[in-house]
Amino acid sequence: MTIDNPSAFLKTLPTGSGVYQMQDAQGKVIYVGKARNLQKRVSSYFRRQLDSKTQAMMAQVQSIQTTITRNENEALLLEASFIKQFRPRYNVLLRDDKSYPYLYLATHQKFPRLDFYRGAKKAPGRYFGPYPNAGSVRENLALIQKLFKLRQCSESFFKNRTRPCLQYQIKRCTAPCVGYVNEQEYRRQVEDAILFFEGKNDQVIIKLTERMEVTSENLVFEEAAHYRDQIRQLRRLQKQQIITGGKGNIDIIGIAESNGAIGFAILFIRSGRMIGHKPFFPNTPLGTTLQTALVEFIPQYYLSPLRNGDIPERIVTSEPLEDRLWIQRALSSGLNRKLAITDQKRAPYKQWQAMAALNAAQALSQHLAQKNTFALKLEAIQKSLALPNPIARIECFDISHTLGEATVASCVVFGEEGPIKKDYRRFNISGVTPGDDYGALRQALTRRYVRLKEGEGILPDVLLIDGGMGQLRQAAEVLEELQVSGVILTAIAKGPGRKAGLEKLFVWGRREEIHLPADNIAFHLIQQIRDEAHRFAITAHCNRRAKRRVESTLQEIEGIGPKRRQKLLKYFGGLQELQRASIEEIARVPGVSETLAKAIYDACHQHKG
């Protein structure tokens, strides 16, 4: 509804709970809010005394749409949904991220494997986490191997060993692959690891102490010494950890502000043990308070499907949380589980709150420093290439294939803060002559810039091509055909002997090559962007090639027709999951014998990687 007459408009608003959307002259949603009383909340925007941020927003508001909800909880959940849908510029916006990684223990296997895992939790077994990032998973994986010596190798590697691998030599595995440990003893290792994951370190220490005493009495001193070392390592770990006093799962949210920017850090406490932390830097309008940022951040983060259903029993914030009970009830309702939120600084959480706030401040400081550094590098590119306007966004394309097979084009995007990975794109190339890099590049650029021209994304200031003047000419022709203007076209070509540092740069419309010194910061960033496009293209190409070869091999297996192939892919949810499956898991598919399962397994691993 337009607001030509605010007084009359406000009288039409309901007094119940709901959500309001503020729209500009083009009908674009620029702010979304929730309210217990819509009339009272929206009226507050028409007072004379408003802060500068709200004044700037209201100067653009042309209409306000309201949605009535049945209760307050529904209003909060709908607000989070609308923010995700419309991405309003005056809301705190949490960037999309990858799903969280786990440690996966294949407990259904005779000798369970412990491994890194990311994705939907379909495979049988135990999942521990989520961890904030891949680094935390690998750090904990190394710790578990050191303490409990569980195998990490793939099924194919495990079943084809005739002697122990290096992991056994460095005392990170007990070598069940060659029978150096029996199933019962290995199961004890697995049980100890599970207790450790669950935070029951005391129980593990009691068990290990009993085994140490028994082996010592039986004069098996080497084994007794092994248990002694395990006990020492566990006790050392206990001293390093701040234990909350409970065994539940807790997220501690720290928040910090610097020069108008706001950053968060979440400490992940699982079973009384901190398994890592992760920083977040949402887009926050200038003038946003810490309390407002916290109120908008929490629902967006915990209602995201990327959480994969992993919600802690308690959330603790380092700053007071407005509408704490409202948010607590709404999240409990929306997530269909009981959730507690604590914002008071008292035992047993006080130390965690201080640590979370410190991590948030430190991460924000580093983020701003990196942002400033990147802005300087973009400015250096503008000066070094003598470009007319400042650069805020660069796209780079590269092509990858193996003798024309499984050609893939990559597009990576860099902005003022570094790589923008959510905007990366890969293009599976088809319908061009194998090995025709020009044709592949034309197809990728056409597909990309048709969408950008139609408004699906943002046009870059600079388009960088991995190649020479020939590739640059293809890019110029595509953009001219699509009538896309305002994009500076550049290319980076390999130098003599393909040596790094000797690359040549081209700018469309200029005849001469550009050679920058090897220590030039603009040159370093151009190389970094080119290398990232190359990495992304190669990864996508290898995956496509492996998938195509496996599909081709599956078609050649006797007994695997189109229907059975479809049944296999449907059962596992895709080719990637089928490749991860063991022979035993494949044999569980209705109509697949153990002999056929082995043939399928061998086919899946013949071309893997």
Curated annotation (Swiss-Prot):
Signal peptide: none
GO cellular component assignments: cytoplasm; excinuclease repair complex
Keyword Cytoplasm included in the entry's annotation: yes
Pfam families, per database record: GIY-YIG, HHH_5, UVR, UvrC_RNaseH, UvrC_RNaseH_dom
Places the protein is found: Cytoplasm
Disulphide connectivity of cysteines: none
Recorded coiled-coil stretches: none
PANTHER family, per the entry: UVRABC SYSTEM PROTEIN C (PTHR30562:SF1), UVRC/OXIDOREDUCTASE (PTHR30562)
Family: Belongs to the UvrC family.
Task performed by this protein: The UvrABC repair system catalyzes the recognition and processing of DNA lesions. UvrC both incises the 5' and 3' sides of the lesion. The N-terminal half is responsible for the 3' incision and the C-terminal half is responsible for the 5' incision.
Name of the molecule in the record: UvrABC system protein C
Organism of this sequence: Coxiella burnetii (strain RSA 493 / Nine Mile phase I)
Lineage: Bacteria, Pseudomonadati, Pseudomonadota, Gammaproteobacteria, Legionellales
